[in-house]
Design a protein with these regions (language model features):
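Nucleotide-activated donor-binding/catalytic signature segment of Leloir-type glycosyltransferases, i.e.
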Residues: 264-285
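Short hydrophobic beta-strand element within catalytic cores of glycosyltransferases
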Residues: 314, 323-326
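Conserved acidic donor-binding segment of nucleotide-sugar-dependent glycosyltransferases
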Residues: 338-351, 359-365
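Conserved donor-binding/catalytic core segment of Leloir-type glycosyltransferases
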Residues: 217-233, 239-242
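Short His-centered aromatic/hydrophobic patch
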Residues: 98-103, 122
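Short alpha-helical donor nucleotide-sugar binding micro-motif in glycosyltransferases
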Residues: 284-285, 292-297
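Acceptor-binding helix/loop patch of EC 2.4 sugar-transfer enzymes
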Residues: 66, 119-157, 198
């Protein structure tokens, strides 16, 4: 197949789960003998316009303004369409696969691209993500944002309706499609996400030595999280849990990786609550160091408040042998809950999180999991190879039907 992969976010240009899914799926499809051409954003034209990542994996970046707004939106519609048409003239695609609605909207409704068989990956509802971003500290959303969100919702429905198949990573996401867009369930296909098992693995030097290397206290329970620092991730609530607890202050340490618009707010919270000895900000963690932090931690914590369509960090941590404590939000129960329901918080509040983390410290042996068991759970269920196999099987059947 000659596949055009349309993605607003793509690893390593950006961090985050959706970009990694697009990257690893593309990479595995190339290894299966397909030609994959990725069309993605290039804010302010800072990255190379065209790049050959592997023998049959090419990335084409279309220029966009740095700041989001109407100009950004219109530029993406126009420039993604232009890039797709130009690439199609040279290559002749027989499949379009998009991972976000905006990047697909320009190409899909312009000829001759609109005639190419099309499938879509639904990671999360576009309009809900937008509303969460626009919500202020008091929990209120401007009316203008609500109007824009209505438009986004309808635009996404048009994209999903046009798709021959809609791929999701979880039953939770499949349920969102049914509840929000009322599309027939037979259009939706759940396929497993993947994990780089050769990169996310057990520490070679042992956890204690790794803690020393990373300057993590040996006499405290190490809780690690890495997220985009935005409101829906629940990092504020995790910090609140430490504020409420002398046990966590004295016997625990929280390591926060990642960047985002809340970074300064979160740092101010830690300072105001006098938590600087208990809560550490690591900033953006390099790809080389990320597995080391998973390996060194006693537990990974996922305090998500809203919209967790899958959670690749769960697989990454467990592949390193480190169990995950998490809120029961979105698709999280489909991984963490299946492994062990006792690792789920009762809810998303700081009190819910505090009680569980204190219990972990006070009854550490009750939460001790064999690292081999954690890793085996991932090995048996998730790999990028399995994902590519499932995707290939589904779309090859579609293309045969379309001929």
């Amino acid at each position: 197949m000659k596949i055009a992969m349309l993605a607003d976010v793509f690893f390593p240009d950006t961090v985050g789960g959706a970009g990694r899914v697009a990257y690893h799926l593309s990479r595995q499809l190339c290894r299966k003998g397909h030609d994959v051409h990725v069309l993605t954003r290039n804010p302010e034209g800072k990255l190379s316009r065209q790049q050959q990542v592997e023998d049959d994996l090419f990335v084409y970046r279309f220029k966009l303004p740095a700041k989001e707004g109407l100009r950004f939106f219109l530029s993406e519609l126009r420039n993604s369409s232009t890039a797709a048409k130009k690439a199609n003239q040279e290559i002749g695609f027989n499949l379009l696969c998009s991972h976000q609605s905006l990047v697909a909207s320009g190409p899909l409704f312009s000829r001759p691209i609109s005639r190419i068989p099309f499938v879509h990956f639904f990671h999360s509802p576009w309009h809900e993500e937008y509303l969460i971003k626009k919500r202020n500290s008091e929990g209120k959303t401007p009316q203008s944002a609500k109007v824009i969100a209505m438009f986004m919702r309808e635009m996404e429905k048009r994209i999903l309706s046009k798709a021959l198949k809609i791929f999701v990573l979880s039953s939770y996401s499949a349920g969102q499609i049914a509840a929000i867009h009322h599309l027939p369930p037979e259009k939706v296909v759940k396929i497993p996400a993947g994990i780089e098992l050769d990169r996310f693995r057990f520490p070679q030097s042992g956890k204690e030595l790794l803690k020393k290397e990373l300057n993590i206290a040996l006499d405290k329970t190490a809780f690690f999280t890495v997220r985009n620092l935005v409101p829906r991730m629940g990092i504020e609530t995790l910090i609140e849990a430490f504020k409420q607890s002398n046990v966590l202050r004295q016997k625990g340490v929280l390591l926060i990786g990642g960047e985002g618009l809340l970074r300064k707010t979160l740092q101010a919270m830690v300072k105001d609550y006098d938590l600087e000895e208990s809560v550490k900000f690591l900033g953006r963690i390099s790809e080389n160091d990320l597995p080391r932090y998973y390996q060194a931690a006693d537990f990974f914590v996922l305090p998500t408040r809203e919209l967790e369509g899958f959670g690749l960090v769960i697989l990454e941590s467990m592949a390193c042998g480190t169990p995950v404590l998490a809120t029961p939000i979105g698709a999280i129960p489909e991984t963490v809950g299946v492994f062990d329901k006792n690792l789920l918080f009762e809810g998303t509040s700081g009190e819910n999180i505090r009680r569980k983390l204190e219990d972990v410290i006070n009854r550490f042996e009750s939460y001790r999991f064999d690292p081999q068991v954690c890793r085996k759970f991932v090995e048996e269920r998730y790999s990028w190879e399995k994902m590519a196999d499932a995707f290939e099987k589904e779309v090859m059947g579609l293309l045969k039907t379309a001929v």
